[in-house]
Curated annotation (Swiss-Prot):
Top-level taxon of the source organism: Bacteria
Residue span, Obg domain: 1-139
Originating organism: Anaplasma marginale (strain Florida)
UniProt protein name: GTPase Obg 2
Record function comment: An essential GTPase which binds GTP, GDP and possibly (p)ppGpp with moderate affinity, with high nucleotide exchange rates and a fairly low GTP hydrolysis rate. Plays a role in control of the cell cycle, stress response, ribosome biogenesis and in those bacteria that undergo differentiation, in morphogenesis control.
Pfam families: GTP1_OBG, MMR_HSR1
InterPro entries: G_OBG (IPR031167), GTP-bd (IPR006073), GTP-bd_Obg/CgtA (IPR014100), GTP1-OBG_CS (IPR006074), GTP1_OBG_dom (IPR006169), GTP1_OBG_dom_sf (IPR036726), OBG_GTPase (IPR045086), P-loop_NTPase (IPR027417)
Quaternary context: Monomer.
GO biological process, one term: ribosome biogenesis
Localization in the cell: Cytoplasm
Gene Ontology cellular component annotations, sorted alphabetically: cytoplasm
Protein family: Belongs to the TRAFAC class OBG-HflX-like GTPase superfamily. OBG GTPase family.
Residues holding Mg(2+): S153, T173
Length: 328
């Protein structure tokens, strides 16, 4: 509230300006970040308050918005973690988590023909305050799946510049890794999903943490270790866990590769290839350590372009998943 006070002006009248609107908290999907680690140490995010109005009819400045970059694939849930609020799938997509309050109204706005000197004003409204849960699902063209020690990390490191850990023991990979492969003008994002074991759909071997990321992959690249005594059972075990987790996963297009063929003779490889093709009713590709991969990348790129992406349905909560992203 303010009144005009100047020399030789006896009845200056009201001149209190309006207050500025408060800033909003906005989340924006960005390729510049790939983890939610920022929120581990910044759990309370505030935008700037609007400035107060002043005399001479001056309006207060609006508060600046607080824009927070989040990885592409971030999902926002309500406080209970049951209701999906927003799904930021595309670069630049944004969502206003909490809108700023409206600025107050100065007494100059209440001047009328019957009230030439109003002594009242209106306070501004409070901004919104929300508690949201964040979950990150990796988004990739190809999800590399299979049992532990099937050679998934080795394939990713050969196709891309990914620095994933590669060793000859199960569960070498304990978190998803992304890599970008290039061949003959084709660009492909591959995700190394940690190995799936029996009862993964029930949470065994951190199954829930891994299976949910497969939902965002366009197609699946299923690696089967050629050296296993029963390759059909190994294949069917992984497929069963996908089915138990979500029927949508079983509908995704799948490319089957018989890996580590250099460990067996050509005759043994051919026999196992026919056995797996007979069981899966799909064409099975054989792969050895020394094989060139450009043709495989081009083939996968073509399959991705033809595939239909299914919408995810998972609503579990994993706030601080760390995703490694490597670009060749």
């Amino acid at each position: 509230m303010s009144f005009r006070r100047e020399k030789f002006i006896e009845f200056g009248g009201p001149d209190g300006g309006n207050g500025g609107n408060g800033g909003s908290v906005i989340f924006v999907a960005s390729s510049a970040v790939n983890t939610l680690l920022y929120f581990r140490y910044n759990q309370h995010i505030r935008a700037e308050n609007g400035k107060a109005g002043s005399g001479k009819g001056k309006f207060g400045a609006a508060g600046r918005n607080r824009v927070v970059e989040v990885p592409v694939g971030t999902q926002l849930y309500d406080e209970d973690g049951n209701t999906l609020i927003a799904d930021l799938n595309n670069i630049g997509q944004q969502y206003t988590v909490a809108a700023g309050g409206r600025g107050g109204i100065g007494n100059a706005q209440y001047k009328s023909s019957t009230n030439r000197a109003p002594t009242y004003f209106t306070y501004g409204t409070l901004g919104e305050e929300h508690c949201v849960l964040l979950k990150l699902k990796i988004v990739s063209d190809v999800g590399i799946i299979g049992m532990p020690n099937a050679g998934k990390s080795s394939l990713l490191s050969r196709c891309t510049a990914s620095k994933t850990k590669v060793s000859d023991y199960p569960f070498t990979t304990l978190e998803p890794h992304l890599g970008v492969a290039y061949a003959n003008g084709c660009e492909l994002v591959l995700a190394d999903i940690p190995g799936l074991i029996e009862n993964a759909s029930s949470g065994a071997g951190l199954g829930h943490k891994f299976l949910k990321h497969i939902e965002r992959c366009v197609i699946l690249l299923h690696l089967v270790d050629c050296s296993l005594p029963d390759i059909v059972s190994a294949y069917e075990l992984v497929r069963q866990e996908l089915k138990l987790h979500s029927q949508e996963l079983t509908g995704k297009q799948e490319v089957v590769i018989l890996n580590k063929c250099d460990l067996l003779s050509e005759g043994e490889v051919r026999e196992k290839q026919k056995l797996l093709e007979s069981s899966t009713k799909k064409e099975v590709i054989t792969l050895s350590m020394g094989d060139e991969l450009d043709s495989l990348i081009v083939f996968l790129h073509a399959q991705v372009k033809k595939a239909v992406v299914t919408e995810p349905s998972d609503t579990s909560f994993d706030p601080f998943l760390y995703v490694h992203y490597n670009k060749k």
